[in-house]
A protein has these predicted regions:
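Noncatalytic carbohydrate-binding groove/subsite architecture in carbohydrate-active enzymes
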Residues: 195, 200-201, 218-222, 262-428, ...
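N-terminal substrate-binding region of glycoside hydrolase catalytic domains
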Residues: 132-264, 297-303, 310-318, 373, ...
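Aromatic sugar-binding surface patches on proteins
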Residues: 91-101
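Short proline/glycine-enriched turn/loop motifs at strand-loop junctions of beta-rich domains
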Residues: 67-73
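Aromatic-rich peripheral "rim/lid" segments of glycoside hydrolase catalytic domains that contact
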Residues: 136-137, 143, 147, 155-158, ...
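Edge beta-strands of extracellular beta-sandwich domains
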Residues: 121-133
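Surface-exposed, short loops/turns at beta-strand junctions within beta-sandwich domains
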Residues: 103-109
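Short, compositionally biased P/S/T/A/G/V-rich stretches that sit at domain boundaries
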Residues: 31-61
Length: 488
């Protein structure tokens, strides 16, 4: 009797399984993506369904995602554009379902990517090929050291792989343009053109680095760096630059005009002055999240008298003393970590400013277009370079310390504007200056990039007199020269 009861139960179970299998074999609109080799009773989560199953360019697509885990802060990215779900999960048989709707790009990628936990840095959930096997586009471009700050997305790079410098703020992480979402779009566009992207990370507008002594600000800044380094959408970033001009009063507005000290910068960058076992510093956090991205020291402003350094350079000028003290701090910190068995705590390179001074009296009648190749030692500054060749002063300091000797240098701000003199490039740019500057830098193997400030910033007009795109006044000559240097 008991045997027959179990047999009947077994037959009912078999019937249920057959009906369930038949249900899944019925034709449905769209298609389920099946991972080869996965057992049918052990799905590879998430399961993705498309409608239509093989969409054509320009078609609107519905995409459903089914998973057993309630992932937060999910996104769908198509050709660099992020989409939020149009329908959120409702529990059905212990599974959760999201739905997106998007248009297949007429041109561009045929792969879409799903992410989760984007509030902490987007983590890949699933990649979906819209048609066939996805192959990364081949970008065959000739490298150049030439680059720009704030690239015009419509710029023709003439088949060259140049440089782009961008900017984001830790305290504006959720804001338009300066925050994470718009930054990821710009990085995607630049990478699609074969460009190398350097992202400068500031604490806040008017406050380049966390104010001296403010550990809460340090925690916030480091959390933002972790988020950027973790975000899969930013894997194409070549390097992160930590701050800029922090030795000047106007870059320390939240600190009552007190500039960041070399020691404080070292604390934020690599934990200088703290126990060697502590990991709450920029370089160790970024390396833990993304070992391949470079971590660069932000530029010291040349010719600023706002801050000095305790370790005097051979040329006793405040900005050079500051730089010498800063590099010394970073070298000391890296050596202390190495001694404790913690490698890779030295920076990967330095961003520097190198502006030209085409009206310098030291030119003494020589052509202003030749200024980048001419030494302009200024007597009142004890022989410090007064023009573009200040980059040589920076190199001398960087190469004087064991852990930084020979590291790459990136000129992330170059033009013919001198702070304090107030003459914009639209009024003083000498024809041929940029050509000469690139010729000089092409002969410097340690200098990897020469970036003009700026290309385009359409959100206000304050930089129009510097812009290659706006072409105000003499900037028309500079813009034509930039294009010619890239090639036909």
């Amino acid at each position: 009797m008991g045997g027959r009861l179990w047999m009947r139960r077994g037959l009912w179970m078999l019937l249920i399984l057959v009906l369930a299998a038949a249900y899944w074999l019925l034709p449905i609109q769209g298609g389920v993506l099946v991972i080869p080799g996965e057992a049918p009773d052990s799905p590879h989560w998430p399961v993705v369904r498309l409608s239509p199953a093989s969409p054509e360019p320009g078609q609107t697509v519905d995409l459903w995602v089914t998973d057993v885990e309630a992932f937060p802060y999910v996104k769908l990215v198509v050709d660099g554009v992020s989409y939020e779900p149009v329908a959120w999960p409702s529990t059905v048989d212990d599974t959760l379902i999201w739905r997106w709707r998007f248009a297949v790009p007429e041109k561009g990628a045929r792969r879409v990517t799903l992410y989760h936990d984007c509030h902490k840095g987007c983590v890949v959930w699933k990649r979906v090929d819209l048609q066939g096997d996805y192959q990364s586009p081949s970008i065959d471009r000739v490298p150049t050291k030439l680059g720009v700050v704030f690239a015009n997305p419509d710029r023709d790079w003439h088949g060259r792989s140049g440089w782009v410098v961008d900017l984001t703020y830790a305290r504006l992480a959720g804001e338009a343009y300066w925050g994470v979402e718009d930054l990821t779009g710009r990085v995607y566009q630049a990478n699609a053109k074969g460009l190398r992207v350097l992202v400068r990370v500031d604490y806040d507008q008017g406050q380049s680095m966390p104010p001296v002594g403010d550990e809460e600000a340090v925690t916030e800044y480091l959390a933002y760096l972790r988020r950027l380094a973790r975000d899969d959408r930013l894997r194409g970033v070549y390097g992160y630059i930590l701050g800029s001009s922090y030795n000047s009063v106007d870059s320390n507005a939240q600190a009552e005009g007190v500039p960041v000290t070399p020691a404080w910068y070292g604390r934020v960058f690599s934990g200088y002055g703290e126990g060697v076992s502590r990991t709450d510093n920029a370089i160790q956090i970024v390396r833990a999240e993304n070992p391949s991205v470079r971590v660069l020291v932000g530029s010291v402003r040349p010719w600023s008298l706002d801050a000095d350094g305790v370790h005097k350079h051979t040329i006793d000028a405040p900005w050079l003393n500051y730089m010498n003290s800063l590099v010394g701090v970073l070298d000391e910190s890296a050596k202390a970590k190495a001694t404790a068995g913690i490698p890779l705590a030295a920076p990967d390179g330095f961003a520097v400013h190198a502006s030209g001074r085409p009206e310098a009296p030291e030119l003494a009648g020589r052509s202003a277009s030749d200024e980048p190749r001419l030494d302009l030692p200024r007597e009142e500054w004890k022989g410090a370079q007064a023009g573009f060749r200040v980059y040589q002063d920076w190199l001398d300091i960087i190469n004087a310390y064991p852990s930084t000797q020979g590291l790459p240098v990136y000129i992330t701000t170059a033009n013919t504007y001198i702070s304090g003199e107030g003459i914009p490039p639209s009024q003083n740019y000498p024809a041929g200056w940029l050509t000469t500057a690139l010729e000089v830098i092409d002969e410097e193997p340690q200098v990897h990039a020469l970036c003009w400030f700026i290309d385009d910033f359409p959100h206000d007009t304050q930089w129009d007199q510097f812009s290659l795109t706006q072409r105000a006044g003499l900037m028309d000559e500079a813009a034509n020269e930039f294009d010619a240097l890239l090639g036909p």
